[in-house]
């Protein structure tokens, strides 16, 4: 399966959870920006989810296309956020929406970040044999 979600990719990542102390105990929470990014990803992914979740090993290919600004279309984005942090939030959302039973099924992964004329996230999933 493959699809493109035309959207401005979120730059906030799963690593940006916050902590506060309540009654002497640490409580972790998601700031509003992270909650909004998660909701945006879930909404876009929901319309693309497979009829039944993957339950076998898969390859996941993701191309993050960020608004190019002053950069050339197709130029690699060698700035933050890091690909591993972007992927964590995306794969968590894909699990929540029902792409697979668990993201541990992603056994091969290719991730790229580019500056692009048309921003969005390209995703391809293939079952491994």
Locate predicted features.
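Acidic, proline/glycine-enriched N-terminal capping motif
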Residues: 1-129
């Amino acid at each position: 399966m493959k699809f493109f979600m035309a959207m401005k990719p979120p730059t906030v990542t799963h690593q940006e959870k916050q902590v506060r102390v309540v009654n002497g105990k640490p409580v972790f929470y998601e700031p509003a920006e992270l909650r909004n990014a998660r909701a945006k990803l879930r909404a876009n992914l929901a319309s693309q989810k497979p009829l039944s979740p993957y339950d076998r090993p898969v390859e996941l290919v993701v191309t993050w296309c960020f608004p190019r600004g002053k950069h050339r279309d197709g130029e690699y984005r060698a700035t933050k956020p890091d690909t591993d942090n972007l992927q964590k939030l995306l794969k968590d959302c894909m699990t929540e929406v029902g792409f697979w039973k668990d993201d541990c099924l992603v056994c091969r992964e290719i991730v790229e970040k580019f500056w692009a004329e048309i921003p969005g996230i390209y995703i391809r999933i293939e079952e491994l044999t």
